[in-house]
Each structure stands twice: as C-alpha cells, then as structure tokens.
Amino acid sequence: MSSVSEVNADIRDFLMSINLEQYLLHFREFGFYTVRDCTSINDSVLHQIGISPTGHRRRILKQLQMIFSKMQDFPIYANVHKAKNGSTTKEQQHSDPSSSTHTGIECSDSITVHRPGPAPSEMVTTSTLSEGNCQSPKSHDKLCLSSHDLLCPEEELHQNVDSSKDSLFGGVNVKIDPLITKRAVEYTAGEEHTEKGNLTSEDSSKALSTNTECLPSGDCPTSGTHSGNGTNGVLESFPPTPFFQFQGEMVVNELYVPSSPVHGPMRSRSKLVSRPSRSFLLRHRPVPEIPGSTKSIPGSYFRDRRSNTTSAGKSLTLKNSNEDNSTSIFPYGETFLFQRLESSKKRSIKNEFWPHENTVKEEAATTRNSILTQSSIYDNRKEKVSEDKVEDIWIPREDKNNLAQDSASESEYSTVEECFQSLRRKNSKASKSRTQKAFYLDPFNRHSYPLSSTSGNTEPSSTISNAISPYACFYGSSAAKEKCGWLDKLSPQGKRMFQKRWVKFDGLSISHYNNDREMYSKGIIPLTAISTVRAQGDNKFEIVTTQRTFVFRVEKEEERNDWISILLSALKSPSLASQLQAAVAPEKCGYLELRGYKAKIFTVLRGNSVWLCKNEQDFKSGLGITIIPMNVANVKQVDRAVKQSFEIITPYRSFSFTADSEREKQEWIEAVQQSIAETLSDYEVAEKIWFNESNRSCADCKAPDPDWASINLCVVICKKCAGQHRSLGPKDCKVRSLKMDASIWSNELIELFIVIGNKRANDFWAGNLQKDEELQVDSPVEKRKNFITQKYKEGKFRKTLLASLTKEELNKALCAAVVKPDVLETMALLFSGADVMCATGDPVHSTPYLLAKKAGQSLQMEFLYHNKFSDFPQYDAHFEGGSSQDAAQSSFLCDFLYQTAAAASRVSSEKKLLEDTNKKWCVLEGGFLSYYENDRCTTPNGTINISEVICLAVHKEDFYLNTGPIFVFEIYLPSERVFLFGAETSQIQRKWTETIAKRFVPFVAENLTEADYDLIGQLFYKDCHALDQWRKGWFAMDKSSLCFCLQTQEAQEERMNLRRLQELTISTMVQNGEKVDVLLLVEKGRTLYIHGHTKLDFTVWHTAIEKAAGTDGNALQDQQLCKNDVPIIVNSCIAFVTQYGLGCKYIYQKDGDPLHISELLESFKKDARSVKLRAGKHQLEDVTGVLKSFLSDIDDALLTKELYPYWVSALDTQDEKERTSKYRAFIRSLPGVNRATLAALIEHLYRVQKCSEINHMNAHNLAMVFSSCLFQTKGQTSEEVNVIEDLINNYVEIFEVKEDQVKQMDIENSFITKWKDTQVSQAGDLLIEVFVERKEPDCSIIIRISPVMEAEELTNDILAIKNIIPMKGDIWATFEVIENEELERPLHYTENVLEQVLQWSSLAEPGSAYLVVKRFLTVDSIKQCREKSIKEGILKLKEEPSKILSGNKFQDRCVVLRDGHLFIYKDPKSSKHDKMFPLRAMKFYLGVKKKMKPPTSWGLTVYSEKHHWHLCCDSLQAQMEWMASIFIAQHENDIWPPAGKERKRSITKNPKIGGLPLIPIQHERNATQARKNIETARAELERLRLSEKHDPRDFTDSSLKDRASLIAHCLEHKDEKLRNRARKHRSFNCLEDTEAEGPHGLPKAYKGPKTLKKTEERNSKATLDADPKLPSKVIEELSVVLQRSRPLHKELPDEQTLQKEVK
C-alpha cells in the first residue's frame, strides 16, 4: 500500500491491524476517524480516551510512529491558521533560482523558539512564529478556505501581542502531517504547482512573515472552489539544505515482497503493520538509486531563518492537495519542518471521496482537537518575558465543548482514501474484541510553550480552544507533588481511637498502611472521592468524602498545613475532572471471600488492576482497601478443601479468594488471566512474523492469527495446539508466545520465521498428509494431541525422500547444507535423523553450528542453536509394517500427571501422598519415564527405567482430590520403591499403563497386556510340574481371573478363576536366610505357589488376589464359588441341611432368629470360605433362613425374571414329557452359574422330599416355600408353585440324572437317617493340663480342648469343675504362661485356646508353657481405666534385638496410650514420636525376662513378629494399671461377655457324619479299646458290602461322603468306661448342656448303653470275617491331620487312596 493510503487509512482498519479494534468507539467518540487524525496523539491522550493498558498504548504509539517514519520524504509541518469568518490571508513569497515555495505561518506573536543541538535524525522541532497582518491578494492568487472542504474542526491558539493591547488572531491551527513514502505516488518532476492561500483576520492586517525553514505541508482550498481548478500554484524558494527531500527511486528489498506470486496494487494488512526492529531495518533498508542532482542547504540557513521570525506578516504557502507528503510524528512531538516539491496533477481528486456535510464527524473532531490542544492554566503575567524562555504548564483534559468548526490543515487529510479503505477491509481479519477500561489515569504530561503564546486574552466572541503548538516539546510526566509520613488516623469503629499509620499521597490518591514497608494499603481515598479538606484543632485535619470523614492528626501545625495545602492544590487541579470522565464500567465485579477478612470483599476488575473494597457502596463512592496491579500478578487455582478458591499472586503478597461456586471461580480466573495477558501483551513480534502470509494461520489446525510458535520446529501455532506441542517435551518442542515472550525473539529468529513460514515448513512436516487426516479448528483435545504427536514426534506425515539415507549420509548432507542459505534443507535433514552435534571433520569448526558461523549464515546458526538438544529419530519408511516390538520401542508419551514416590512403609497412605503433591510433567521415551517440575524444565526431577519394573498396579476406581477425581497407577521396583502417578481421566491412565506394560512385559507374554488388567507383573512360581524349583512367570489380574504365562515349552497363556478357589492360604518359607511369604492357590485339580520379588509387591498381589477371590456384589455370578460353579453359601447351607435336617420335621417351614440369620448372611457375603457351619454353634432354622434369604435377595431371580412368562406358560402343556422338555430348554438358556445352582438346589430338594415320611416335607410343601424365592415374587401363586413342584418331581428327567446316581442318593439318605443317633467325637480334640490359680500338682486339671473352644468356655469349665464361684465384681480369665513363668498374659474371652497352645511350638522351651485360670481384674479397676481415655507416663524401654546406637540399656521414655496405639517419645516435650505400636498387632505380657537385666521387677513385654520391647514400671500398681489399660484399649472395652449372652459350646454330640473324626490324645491303656472299635468298623464294612449284592462297581462308584461317614463311624472310640471318666471331669452344668444340645427336631444325641448294645448286635451279624488291624496308612493320615489341628470339616484324601484303605 502506498504511504498516502497508510496515513489516510480509516482508524478501524488501523486498530484491526494491531488487534485493538475494541477501542474503535473510544477513538471515534473523541473525533479520531483516520490515521491522519492521530498525528498529535501521545500517551496522555490515549490514557484519557480510555486506553488503560500500558502495552496497548505503547503498541498504538509505536505503530503510529512506524507509519509516519516509513515515509521516504523528510517531515514537513504545515501550520495553517484560519480566520474566524473565512477571510483569506496574504501570502508572502520568497523567490529563489529554483522557484520553489514555502509556507508562512500566521500567528499573533513573532517569537521563535529553537532548541539547538539535536542531530538531524532526532527531528527536533524548531518553532518560528511571526506576527503580522494578512492582506487580501488578487483574485487569481486567492484560495478561499471553505469550511465544508475541511476535515477537522478549527483549533485556536490565543496569543498575547503586546503589553498594552492584544491583537488576537482566532482559529490558529497547528497540525502535524504524517510522513508518506515517496514511491507510493507517481509524479513528474517538471510539473510542480503550488497555490497561494490568503488568510485574513478581523483584528490585524499584518502578514505573518515567511519562515524560511518551513516547507508547505498541506493544502488550503479557496472559498470559491472545492477542487482547486483555475488556481495557479506559486512555489516559494528556499536555500539548499542537507535535509532536503531526496527524490530518487527507491529499490524494494525482496525480504518484504509477499510470498504469493500474485501481488495486488496495495500491501496487505500484515505488511502495513509489520514493524521491523532497528537493526533489521538497517540491514534490509531500501537502497535508493543515485539521483541526477541534489541541492544542499548551507549551515547558516537556519540562522538566517531565525532572524526572519520578526516579520510582521503571517504567510502560508499552499501545496497541491493530491501530493502525498506529510509530516512525520516522532516521540514527544519534536520535529523539524521540511519541504519537498510536489505535483499538483491529482489535486482535484480529494473532494470526490470526502463527505463535507458530516456534522457528527465535525463535532467529534472538535472534541478531539480540544483534547489535543486545550490548556486551562495560563499565567496572565504583566512583566515582559524573554523570547526563548519556556514554561511548563499542565495540559487539562476536561474541556470538550469549545470547538472550532474548520481546520486549515484540511488538505493534509483530503487525499484519496475511501477506495483503499474498502480494499483493505476485505483483507482485514477481526481479532477477538476485548474491553480494557481504566479506573485511574497516569500522571499528566507536560508540554513547553512560548510564554508569549499563552499570555493573550481571548475575545468573548471567539471560540475558546487552547491548541498545542507544533513547536511544543514533550518532557514526560509532570512531577506531581507527593507527600508521605507517619500520621495518627482515627479508627472508624470500636473505641474510636487514633492509630499510627503510614500515609502516602501520590498526587492521585491518599493511601494508608500499617508500616512503611508494606506494598498494599489498608485503605485508599482517591482525589475524585474527596469533597474537601479542612483543618481542626489539636493539629488534626479532616478529609471529607460522600461516605465518611477521615480524621488524621500530626505532631506539628506546620506539617498539618503542608498536608492541607498539598491536598487542596491537588483538588483544584484541572486534571481532576478528567479522572472523573475516565471512570468506566468494570469487566468483572462481585463479592468474594478474602483470606484474612471476616466479611466478604467487593472485588472489582477494571483494566489492568483489581480493586478491593469493603462493599459496593464504597466502590461507587471511590473508596477502596487496596489496588492489585495486574502487570506483576499471576492467578492460579488453589488445591484446598474449598474447591472454589483461587489466588492472585504478586511478588509482595498473595491474595486468596473464595467464590460462591465453581463456575464463578472459573469466570474470575479467566477474567484475571485475560487482564494479565492483555496488560503484558505486545503485538510487535506477532506483526513482524505475520508478515509472511502463511504465518497468519496455525500450522496444524489452520486457526487464524496464531500467537504462539515452536521456535525449534519453526512453525507458528495457535493457543490450543501450543498446549499439545508442550506434550512433545521441552527437548523436542520449545513453545513460546509471540506476544509475551519478547526477550526470546531476536531479529535473526524473527527473520527465520519470515523466511521459512508455515507453508514451507508444512511442505516437509505434512508432505504426505491426506485430506481426511487434517486437523480441524474445533478438533477435541485428544485428537489434537494424537495428531501433533504423529506429525512431529513420529513423523507420520512428513516427506520420506531422505528415508533411504543412513545416519552417516544424513550427517554429511547436514554439514554441506549449513553453509548455504537454504534453511529448509537443513530443517529437513535435521528432523529426518541427522545429528545436530555430528562431527564435521574440521578440527576447528567441529560442529555444524561452527560451520554455519564460519560461512556467515546467521539464519542457519539461529536454527541450529534452538535445536541443539533436539533428538529426532531416523524414521523407517516401512515402520508401520514392523513388529509390535518395534512399535513399543518407538512409544512416546508425555503429559501432566500427579506424581510422588513412596517407600514401602508409606505405601498405605498413598492417596494422602498424592494430595500433598503437585502435577509433574512426565515424559516416557526410550524406555525411561522422566518427570519434570514443569514442561519448561530440561532437567528431570527423577527417571525410572521401565525395564526394571516388576509390577504395575492400576486403580480403576477414581479417587477425589481437592482438584477433582484422579485415576492412579503404581510402579513397583525391585529396590522396594513404589512410584504413584495420577491422571485426570481414565483414558489418560489407560494409555500410560498400556504403554508402560508393553515396555517391560516380554514378547512371549504380550497377550497379557491386551487384557483389561488391574495388576500386571512378574512373580516367582512353582506348580505340579516342578515343585522343587522356583521359576519366573508373568501374571495379570483381569477382574476375577488370574492370567499367567509360565516358563514352559508351550508358553501359553493360562487362566485361573479366583472365585472358584478351593484354597487360598499364605505361608512362610526361608530363602537365602530371609523369610519369604508364599501364597498357595488351589482351583479344582490345579495347585500354584507364588511369591514376589519383595514384600511390597507380594503384598500388592496378595491383596488383589484376596479381593478378586471374594464376593464382589449381589449378583449370583459375583459370589465365591465351589468347584462346580455353585456359590459357597448355597453349597454350605445345602450340605448342613442335608446332614442335620433330613430327619427334622417341617425343616424349611420353620423360621429362625432374624438377628442370627442376618449376621450369618453377612458373614457369608464378607468371606464365604471362612464360614464353617457347625452343629451346636449354628441352628438349623437359621441356616435354612440364610438360604431362603440369599435366593430372595440376589440381583436377579435364580430362574431369571426374563424367563418368568415362559416358565408359567409351560404349564399349559398337558403332556408331562413335552413339559419336561420345555423345562430342560429353559434351564439350558440360563447363565452357567444359575444353571449349576439350580441343579444343586433341586437335587437337594429332591433328596429332602425323598425323606418326606420323616420330615413331612413333600414336593408341594417345598414348592410352596421356594417358589417366591426362585421367582422373587411377592407372595405365592399356584402357577409358580406348580412349576417348582414339577422341577422337584421330575428332577431325574429334567436334569438327566443317571440311575446309579439316584441309587447312590438313596444310600446316602439311608446312612444319614440310620446313623443320626450315633455319638461321634469331635475331630482334633486334645487333652491338656490346666492349672487353677498357681502351678501345683493339686491345682491341675486335665481337660479336653476342642479346636473351636474359646477362653470363656475353658474358664467356666474349670471353675465349674473346681466348684469355684467368683466373688461379685471379680473377673476370672485364662492366662498363658511362657518363658519359664517369667511372662504371662490374659487371654481374651473370644480367643481360641487351641490356636494359642499350638503356637508354643515356636518357643525356645515349649514344655515350660502352660495355661492357668486365675483372678484378673475387678469391676472397679476396669471402671477407673475406662474413665481415662489417654494414659501416659515415664517408663524404661529396651528393644530386642537392640540397635547399635541405643546400646544394651534401658532408657527413659515417655509412653502414651491413645487411640488404640502406644506412642513412644524421647521426652514429654517432644512433638514427634519415635515409635508407634498398634495394639491389635501386638501381644502384651506381664513381666520381663531376667536375662534382660531389668532395673525393676515390674514390667511389660511387647511381642511383634520381628521385635520385642521391654517396658519397666516403678511399682506393681503401675504395672497392673498399664496392663489393664492396654488390655481394655486393645479390645475396645469388650473384655467380658455381655450380660445374658448364651455360652457357646465346643463339644457337640452330632458332628457331621461325613467328617473325619480324630482319635483324641489318651493314655496308652485305651489303645486296646481303640482296636476293638476298629474291628467292629471292619465288620460293619463287610456287612454293607454284602448288602450291595457283592457288586464291586456300585461300591466303587459310591460317593466320597458315603465312605467318609462310614470311616467316621468306624473310628468311634467312646466306650462306657471312658465316657464315665470324661463325665467325671466335667461339671454338672456341662452335662446338662450336653443333653440339651443338638439341632432342633432331632432326637437326643446321647442314648446311653442301650445304643451301644444295639450297635454290637448289628456288628455281630456280619457274614464276613473282619481283619483285626486297620491299615497303617489310615493311621498315618489321621496323625497328620491331628498334628495340623485342622477344623472339623475337611476334605478327605483322594478317592483312590480311600478305596485302598477301606479294602
């Protein structure tokens, strides 16, 4: 675009070109419609019209300066003065040989102001005013000034003529013309025309003498014509000058030629506003051709002109209106006036495009001129002042009403413009509009004026307009009077007392602080809010506002008067009104909670500052607390419990705010961030880089006006893509802002972006990008991130021309390319895999960078410098066809993740660790996971070698932090370290875990990584194939399945359903001198032993397997299952009822205790494997109630609600076989677990109805009970009952049961009902010796201990045997005594006695341990201990094994018992404990071993798994108090059975017939009786074998339960003598309980000698001889079972072994 179009551009286009179109209304409101109107704009004017951000004002001023300075001509000022009534002035002509002309300036004073010394390049203004009277010239020399020909209103300068009487020339206008590039206008040197314009004055006839230093810069049309036709131009002569305009042709630098092959007649907006730096302009400035002749001006020329300023006339030389020269605006308005010869051919064009009757524009322009020129403070001095004296005066801003109607500089604005404006608008792109308002203005600027120009009187009839002289010098802001000091301020509330405050007045407001070091005030009073200031007595003064009166007090009266005078003078300042006018609406306001303040604070965001006010009324009155400037602030979201919190952080203080909602908080954060960005933004770099048209759209998504860039990839990108570019890592992508990172943008880097551009860069990066793969502007974040990673990191779309080159060839090509100017070739080589630091072969210039430096290629150097850390791999063109292993090698990920590392001891508090950490920038590349403090850091905080990972845990459930949900995964290393990472979405979590798993799981087990695993890693294992050797295998947890790939020849993936586990136990083995935990898993016929690398990863696996093997939900398939896929709860209930309920009347029609049913059902749901149903402990009715409740409460009915209409409709079929066939089809359609459960349940009900003669439960009665359970309906219907009855009656046909299975069922029923009265001993009973009160022979009792006996039962039995009745208030307990009677501890009443006894085997001297029953506590002591929730004291402590530093001595420690833990402190004043013992995990014994050499004999010993601690007390009372307190706290006050609780019995008379009873420990004399019992069992076996008609197949096929029952009966060893002896050792209460025990509905268990006699009679009827000895293997197996002390119901040996033993 030509420079004339630039100068005359519409203000809208100008603001759009610098992305500040939000200020369009501000400019138009004050009369700025074109760029030419802005010639006199400075920082103060911009501030007044409402542009508060400093960066925006600076950008506007720089752009205006650039436009005016781009003119190739020298600047010219035309100072045109217009008469009030439109009369003409006489022009004084000065002839010279060149016939050139210059204008005179009409002014009332002949005073010249000149600042000597500046260099020509500084363009210092030399102002010359000549006083004179304008004469009317001839008609052909006249050029009337028509008001409608002028663009701008008139501005008047009132000047004092002399001391006696002033002669005023109204309407003197001063206008600065923009500089216009000469090459934009074509003219002929020989055709030069000027016009004479005459100005007349009604008060004076003196003509303004010609200033020989001025040249014409504007046209003044005559009143007779608008176009200037018929007017002869006269050129004024001027002497040669070194500043004379050079008129040669300029050569355009190719750097600024657009890359587009087609160029329009004008430059685009990007070229218009691009402002290169000074060094860039110097290097690439246009080179003019040598002219034919030049003229110089002697140095004495200006001195001659200075002497001519006393001329009595004012002359004005008019130039052609079509000429494109104008004056340049420079900082502070300091310019010289120059002239150049212009052509007048196109003068008449100006009026064709300019509207002359635009009244609105004229009024607005009048406002503009009043802002630019008015001055309200003048000194009417009487004395004569020297001509060269200059006075600083304020420039007020409030007068907008005194307007002139015309401007003498009309020709400066009347150039061809409108046609160019329409073209430019088409190329303009609108930027996002932002509103930035100012609350307060900066201190006002000062200008210097000649005193004579300000001392004149203004005529009443003249329009008052105080114009700024073009000769004014800008010296910056005036030094406003400031004052600060310590004052006493009267508090507004409370006692109204004076408080010391540091008070500061900065010329705009009064603020008070707590001290002189604080940066933010406690209160602020702007001048605009002050009504008056008045003095009071006692050295006080008041500041009165509309809201309240502030009272201050000083020490001295002089100081008070000084404060008052300063404040009053500031109040009288004319600048105060301009502050009021500038107050505009805020961008955001509202009440927020501010930390440190009780009440909510009214917070206001206005422009570049945040105001804090007590309330909205204070804000409206102008009062505030403090102001937070945004240019030094930052805003961030706070991770606190209150989610609506955010902080504004400044270098001096952080302000923490809390909003009412999350939405409001986000709005505040966005508003503050936008204010900060706009305050700090500078478009200078962006405009330069946008000079290349391809850089005006994002390189990735084509978004317009991108303001970010990757400085090493050389692409310009938008804000959305910039966020994803950061994910590539700081080494591979350095993202910088074009607006805010100004320090990084050197001239060379800017030039590099202009030369390359997005188009050429994408020719390489996206050379193979298909149309359907392109990224759209509105693409989601995940797609954008994947695209950018594929494009730059993986090189998926780049050109592959260099793919065939090796690394060495690429390096050689790079060395050859860097010495040439083509940077694109270097970029292609480097990003194709060439090494930026490769060896060049030159010992001096050893790197490509040094080679480029040697060759002087600055752009190559710049590119290589920013890529010095880049490491782009050499991509294979056939990469996609490679193996998955290769794909894993190229995996790359990066993102912000929550990250923290934890030791093994702290992993339990992993979520708390994540709460205390911040996000880290995590990068996974090359098999290493590195985490950085942020995405700009180049040094990682830590690095994890993925190949060393042994376990990866993925938490599917989300965990909520203060910032929202996070999804955690853990990485375990062999060094007992665990790293926790948290992602914000499950997709990010899955992406990271999949990539990490593929890095450390080998190829042979890659199928494991494809599952939806919760845990994956490596474990050691043993199985049935090799039990003697531990091997490594890869395991993965997929919901309830354990997938594993073992080191076998097949190496196939296997799967184990953890819900079907028959056994899940943990044991310990010693390996390499250390204890290692081993997990045993048994599923059907498979056994697997596993252990981890460390205790930490084993704990993770064990916990996960236990959780997966447990119950997970209320659905049928989520229950723990047996090996036949029947839920354990169903199987256990069926087995219990089958064993004990076949002979019970109305078994399923009786209701149990609802409380017991609920407890038992909850136990099954918690862990069904651990629940063992035992007669005596569980009632039959409760078990049946559990079964019915479970079937009724599962999520879906066992027969499924979906099939309900089909089941009922089957009853319509009359044919029983056809109906049975339908039932069979329905059952096949059921889910597998439902089908197996239904089969087991119907089999059980079929068995029950088979015994209906005994239990009275036929098929119909059973169907009445179970129809509502199986269909889950309310109540019963006949159809449902009939369906269930059909299923029971037709069980054999529906489930296709074989005949031998039915026969076996009948045999089992007969055995169960036949042997129901037989008394069988409890399995695993032991006879042990228990002492009463002390260990003496007379105090011992030998008693039978069952595996389920608890300490309560043992204590009561011993007391009953000894006939001891405890005293009221005494508590007796069983004590365990060990270590040769040195240590003892009371057993809790619920502790299992046998378990404690079996643990004695691990003691050094097991034989010294025994049990004793004695008095423990009293009720009174318990009450005292319960009252003290916290117990503390000083005890002596010693640890075993002792630490090296602590020595082998007891040391005083402060011990505190609190919250179920025992805390050890070094001293009572310590705030951090040394040790902490959880009470439930410890055993506490009374006493201390003597070998520990305790200082006292009263102490406690604490046992843990690895360590022992010894505590010594001062007295026996203290010892007992500590023990009682610990015992009560350890069991949470539950230390004796509740009143009325029924005592449990462990000795049962009817144990399970199918169980395997054991021979109790007896004296040797009982062996003979045992052999007799075995012989009797053999005879019974033979009799049963004969009853099966000697069919060996039938006997072999009999069930395991049948033979187990048989052996159980054979091992009956209770003869009459032994029974009498056992009865002798039990109390009478026990005998009564024995008679009363047994399931409801069964006969009494004990029948006496008659039962034995009947049994002997049956045995005598055996037809076969019995072997007198039982096979030895049976005895061995029974011994093993006895040693293990297993519970009653255990599985028997396998079927073949049992058959062998029976035979």
Swiss-Prot record:
GO CC, any one term: cytoplasm
Low complexity compositional bias, start-end: 222-232
Chain ranges of the SAM domain: 6-70
Residue ranges with Basic and acidic residues bias: 1653-1670, 1688-1703
The keyword Transmembrane helix appears for this protein: no
GO biological process terms, semicolon-separated: signal transduction
Ranges of residues in domain PH: 480-572, 585-677, 899-1001, 1012-1110, 1428-1531
GO molecular function, one term: phosphatidylinositol-3,4,5-trisphosphate binding
Signal peptide range in chain numbering: none
InterPro entries from the UniProt entry: Arf-Rho-GAP_ANK-PH_domain (IPR052227), ARFGAP/RecO (IPR037278), ArfGAP_dom (IPR001164), ArfGAP_dom_sf (IPR038508), PH-like_dom_sf (IPR011993), PH_domain (IPR001849), RA_dom (IPR000159), Rho_GTPase_activation_prot (IPR008936)
Region: Disordered, residue numbers: 84-132, 191-232, 286-319, 1633-1670, 1684-1703
Record-linked PROSITE patterns: ARFGAP, PH_DOMAIN, RA, RHOGAP, SAM_DOMAIN
Residue stretches making up the Ras-associating domain: 1324-1418
Domain Arf-GAP positions: 674-809
Residues bearing PTM Phosphoserine: 1627
Biased composition range(s): Polar residues: 85-103, 123-132, 197-214, 308-319
Site (described: Arginine finger): 1149
Compartments in which it is found: Cytoplasm
Record field: transmembrane: none
Keywords for this protein: Cytoplasm, GTPase activation, Metal-binding, Phosphoprotein, Repeat, Zinc, Zinc-finger
Disulphides: none
Chain positions of all zinc fingers (C4-type): 698-721
Biological role: Phosphatidylinositol 3,4,5-trisphosphate-dependent GTPase-activating protein that modulates actin cytoskeleton remodeling by regulating ARF and RHO family members. Is activated by phosphatidylinositol 3,4,5-trisphosphate (PtdIns(3,4,5)P3) binding. Can be activated by phosphatidylinositol 3,4-bisphosphate (PtdIns(3,4,5)P2) binding, albeit with lower efficiency.
Protein's name in the database: Arf-GAP with Rho-GAP domain, ANK repeat and PH domain-containing protein 2
Gene that specifies this protein: Arap2
